Amino acid sequence: MEPTSKKLTGRLMLAVGGAVLGSLQFGYNTGVINAPQKVIEEFYNQTWMQRYGEPIPPATLTTLWSLSVAIFSVGGMIGSFSVGLFVNRFGRRNSMLMMNLLAFVSAVLMGFSKLGKSFEMLILGRFIIGVYCGLTTGFVPMYVGEVSPTELRGALGTLHQLGIVVGILIAQVFGLDSIMGNQELWPLLLSVIFIPALLQCILLPFCPESPRFLLINRNEENRAKSVLKKLRGTADVTRDLQEMKEESRQMMREKKVTILELFRSAAYRQPILIAVVLQLSQQLSGINAVFYYSTSIFEKAGVQQPVYATIGSGIVNTAFTVVSLFVVERAGRRTLHLIGLAGMAGCAVLMTIALALLEQLPWMSYLSIVAIFGFVAFFEVGPGPIPWFIVAELFSQGPRPAAIAVAGFSNWTSNFIVGMCFQYVEQLCGPYVFIIFTVLLVLFFIFTYFKVPETKGRTFDEIASGFRQGGASQSDKTPEELFHPLGADSQV
């Protein structure tokens, strides 16, 4: 039975692969706005000239560009907070399928913005694709976590982050001036998102609905059993069904969990706090400052070909996500998150030193590249992939949609703050801007060390019962004490 449960079947690969196309969309739309900044700003200037007969004021251009970057996160905040409205009503798979309509609308708006001489169309398109991506960051980890066997849940959950970083890398390559990041083709660069949306529309109808949703939410045991047999590649799915039934019985003893209930109930208070702080540790680590403004950071560091250095960081990004994929089930979530936070803090200090001494020591530009590459690598070891799927692991079926909505909203809100404020904070702090992120990284390390339990190898119900047993006094317990009933290996 044990070896069978670990099997990576064709149907499971199809289900996860179809879902993470949404993750790729998220990554692509995060990274695509970076490289063509100058040509899009020129489009804004030309449009302004045609309307008002004068060049666009520099302050207005900065505001419009910051809005073009940050409006994506506003859409993401709205989308992430709406996850529960869809997944409980339409199911996990059907929700992902329906949301592709937003991607098609966004592609049309951004693709025809130049023809329509309207920067408003581009900004609206960025907002709509942001809503799509906000929903996706809830749908994909939830679906992947629910279709995956316990032994593969961490590795397959990391594929969400792998989809994101591959999307960022594709955006960086497509954004090269010699490919699509030029005066003529930038509308195509922004609208090419219709291709993964179309591909997902073709694949998802062949993917199964989440068996947990079918059994626990819809009480369709026969369908859930049939889906499990296909996903596991075996006729014996007794253990999975038994675990889901136990979780279903536990849900029936609980009243319906709303977002407010997550914060009122002692059983949910600690896991929701952990979920939110882990999401903040991802976004407030400074990683999106690197993603959004990497080209300009490399320019300031004196790098001759900054766009290629940016692509180099994208390759490092992807490579270390693959590393995380293979070690997450061995090393554990908590350990990797701690290593990632500590490494990023060290690289942020190096980056600060390199930028501060650049004028006196030109060779410091090379140190800045090493520091940024190291920063990105350590991010993908832990803070990149782990917050996405650990939220789904911390909660049982009942509170999971509400918890993912709260965690996603926290992620996108902090994403918005970084995207909107980094340019201004950088102007204020100069080369010392990454000291702010260093302090935050140290604080997140301390929180993770004292509060975050290990979830590796545990069923959803085992993890949730660990918090329930803590009850009202759980805030006084260490992760080891809180999860002691789950076995001696609760910490890695």
UniProtKB/Swiss-Prot annotation:
<feature type="region of interest" description="Disordered">
    <location>
        <begin position="468"/>
        <end position="492"/>
    </location>
</feature>
<dbReference type="GO" id="GO:0055056">
    <property type="term" value="F:D-glucose transmembrane transporter activity"/>
</dbReference>
<dbReference type="GO" id="GO:0098793">
    <property type="term" value="C:presynapse"/>
</dbReference>
<dbReference type="GO" id="GO:0030496">
    <property type="term" value="C:midbody"/>
</dbReference>
<feature type="glycosylation site" description="N-linked (GlcNAc...) asparagine">
    <location>
        <position position="45"/>
    </location>
</feature>
<feature type="topological domain" description="Extracellular">
    <location>
        <begin position="356"/>
        <end position="365"/>
    </location>
</feature>
<dbReference type="GO" id="GO:0005886">
    <property type="term" value="C:plasma membrane"/>
</dbReference>
<feature type="modified residue" description="Phosphothreonine">
    <location>
        <position position="478"/>
    </location>
</feature>
<dbReference type="GO" id="GO:0065003">
    <property type="term" value="P:protein-containing complex assembly"/>
</dbReference>
<dbReference type="GO" id="GO:0001939">
    <property type="term" value="C:female pronucleus"/>
</dbReference>
<feature type="topological domain" description="Extracellular">
    <location>
        <begin position="34"/>
        <end position="66"/>
    </location>
</feature>
<feature type="binding site">
    <location>
        <position position="388"/>
    </location>
    <ligand>
        <name>D-glucose</name>
    </ligand>
</feature>
<keyword id="KW-0597">Phosphoprotein</keyword>
<dbReference type="InterPro" id="IPR003663">
    <property type="entry name" value="Sugar/inositol_transpt"/>
</dbReference>
<dbReference type="GO" id="GO:0045494">
    <property type="term" value="P:photoreceptor cell maintenance"/>
</dbReference>
<feature type="modified residue" description="Phosphoserine">
    <location>
        <position position="226"/>
    </location>
</feature>
<dbReference type="GO" id="GO:0001674">
    <property type="term" value="C:female germ cell nucleus"/>
</dbReference>
<keyword id="KW-0472">Membrane</keyword>
<feature type="modified residue" description="Phosphoserine">
    <location>
        <position position="490"/>
    </location>
</feature>
<feature type="transmembrane region" description="Helical; Name=10">
    <location>
        <begin position="366"/>
        <end position="388"/>
    </location>
</feature>
<feature type="binding site">
    <location>
        <position position="317"/>
    </location>
    <ligand>
        <name>D-glucose</name>
    </ligand>
</feature>
<feature type="topological domain" description="Cytoplasmic">
    <location>
        <begin position="207"/>
        <end position="271"/>
    </location>
</feature>
<feature type="transmembrane region" description="Helical; Name=11">
    <location>
        <begin position="402"/>
        <end position="422"/>
    </location>
</feature>
<dbReference type="GO" id="GO:0007417">
    <property type="term" value="P:central nervous system development"/>
</dbReference>
<feature type="binding site">
    <location>
        <position position="380"/>
    </location>
    <ligand>
        <name>D-glucose</name>
    </ligand>
</feature>
<feature type="topological domain" description="Cytoplasmic">
    <location>
        <begin position="451"/>
        <end position="492"/>
    </location>
</feature>
<keyword id="KW-0762">Sugar transport</keyword>
<keyword id="KW-0812">Transmembrane</keyword>
<feature type="topological domain" description="Extracellular">
    <location>
        <begin position="423"/>
        <end position="429"/>
    </location>
</feature>
<dbReference type="InterPro" id="IPR036259">
    <property type="entry name" value="MFS_trans_sf"/>
</dbReference>
<feature type="topological domain" description="Cytoplasmic">
    <location>
        <begin position="389"/>
        <end position="401"/>
    </location>
</feature>
<feature type="transmembrane region" description="Helical; Name=8">
    <location>
        <begin position="307"/>
        <end position="328"/>
    </location>
</feature>
<dbReference type="GO" id="GO:1904659">
    <property type="term" value="P:D-glucose transmembrane transport"/>
</dbReference>
<dbReference type="GO" id="GO:0016324">
    <property type="term" value="C:apical plasma membrane"/>
</dbReference>
<feature type="topological domain" description="Extracellular">
    <location>
        <begin position="113"/>
        <end position="120"/>
    </location>
</feature>
<dbReference type="InterPro" id="IPR005829">
    <property type="entry name" value="Sugar_transporter_CS"/>
</dbReference>
<dbReference type="GO" id="GO:0042802">
    <property type="term" value="F:identical protein binding"/>
</dbReference>
<dbReference type="GO" id="GO:0005829">
    <property type="term" value="C:cytosol"/>
</dbReference>
<protein>
    <recommendedName>
        <fullName>Solute carrier family 2, facilitated glucose transporter member 1</fullName>
    </recommendedName>
</protein>
<dbReference type="InterPro" id="IPR045263">
    <property type="entry name" value="GLUT"/>
</dbReference>
<feature type="transmembrane region" description="Helical; Name=3">
    <location>
        <begin position="91"/>
        <end position="112"/>
    </location>
</feature>
<dbReference type="GO" id="GO:0015911">
    <property type="term" value="P:long-chain fatty acid import across plasma membrane"/>
</dbReference>
